[in-house]
Every structure is written in C-alpha cells, then in structure tokens.
Regions:
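Short, basic, low-complexity termini and linkers enriched in Ser/Thr/Gly/Pro
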Residues: 1-22
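Active-site-adjacent structural elements in enzyme catalytic cores
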Residues: 23-197
Length: 197
C-alpha cells in the first residue's frame, strides 16, 4: 500500500516523552515527502528512552522499538504474546551498509538482489553475525528490511541503529492488517507511545 496522503502534525499535550509509564500515545501526522525534523526528533527521543512506535512503511504499519533497548524489546514481545528469544522480528535498516552491520558477509549474487530490491516492500532472511543484540544471539538468521518510506528511513537514520519491528495485525478476519492510522491509534493508544501517520 502506497501512502502519499498529505500529513500534518498533531501533538497530544498530555503525553510525556520521558516518563513512559504514565502515557496515552501521541498521534503524529508527518508528511512523507518532507518529514518534519521536529516530529522525527520526538520519535527518535521516545525510541531512545525505551518507547514503542507504530509507524508507516511501504507495506503495512509496523510496531517498532530501538534494537539496543532490552525493556522495549520485552514490551513488544509481551504485546505480541511471544518470548523475546523466540520472536521473529525484523530489523528495519536505513540502507545496505546498515544491513551489513548485522549479517554475515554475503555473496555477490545476493548483494545484487538486495541492491536491486531495496528500498522496497521485502523482508530478506539472512544469516546473522556476532553484532546481533544479546537477545537475538541464538538466532542463526534475521529478517532485514529497508522500506521505501521516507518517514521510516529518516527515523532509523537519526536513531543511528535499526528498529526492531513487527507488523500490526488486525483482529478482523477479513482485514488482516490495519491500514487506517486513526483506528490503529484508537486500538493501540494505551500500549504504545507514538502512532505515526
């Protein structure tokens, strides 16, 4: 699903970015064609402080956190109802060089495929290396994404490391993934810190 709608910023004045225990999520609207620097910095600050963010990608909305924050990783695993060490989360990276920080050296053919396909709506399952966070050390492979979405890429660039991510599932039997950010906010506002549209 391509998201080319015009976006603006709406901030919830009751939200406190640093005290993440007493919160109702903030709903941020950001222009994909020109992501607002102030809004992106707020998202990065929340991620660095252990927050969870729902954000648009080039496919469906993702639920993500900073790869270096164990408590945030545990929160996502709890929300998804899985043990962290058994969770199959993707690493959202900013570009191919970022990917190489977390995977073993790949052959030329695989590199050419990645270069041609990314950024794009694909998750590549690749062999992980020794730089994986301790929570993922037992995994031999990791899912790697570089979404074709300026908001997601700018968040990862400014954060300086990948976002651990999973898709937002809908309980509706007909519609498996939610694509309406206002409905997502309504459902997730007490579980996450920011919902971005």
């Amino acid at each position: 699903i391509r998201r080319n709608r015009v976006k603006a910023i709406y901030l919830n004045p009751k939200s406190n970015f640093l005290n993440l225990k007493s919160f109702m999520a903030q709903f941020l609207k950001i222009y994909e064609n020109n992501p607002n620097e102030v809004a992106i910095k707020k998202v990065v600050e929340v991620l660095k402080n252990g927050g969870l963010v729902i954000y648009p990608t080039d496919t469906v909305y993702g639920l993500g956190c900073d790869i270096t924050n164990t408590k945030a990783l545990e929160r996502i695993a709890k929300i998804k109802g899985v043990k962290l060490e058994k969770a199959n989360f993707s690493f959202v990276c900013s570009d191919l060089s970022h990917i190489s920080d977390y995977i073993k050296q790949i052959d030329t053919t695989t590199f050419k495929i990645l270069k041609r396909a990314l950024p794009g709506p694909y998750t590549f399952i690749l062999p992980g290396n020794n730089n994986l966070p301790k929570e993922f050390k037992k995994k031999t492979t990791v899912g790697i994404r570089v979404p074709d979405n300026a908001i997601a890429l700018e968040i990862v660039r400014q954060l300086g490391n990948p976002i651990v991510s999973t898709s937002i599932h809908d309980e509706d039997e007909v519609l498996e993934y939610s694509t309406d950010p206002e409905l997502i906010f309504e459902k997730w506002q007490n579980l996450v810190d920011i919902v971005i549209d």
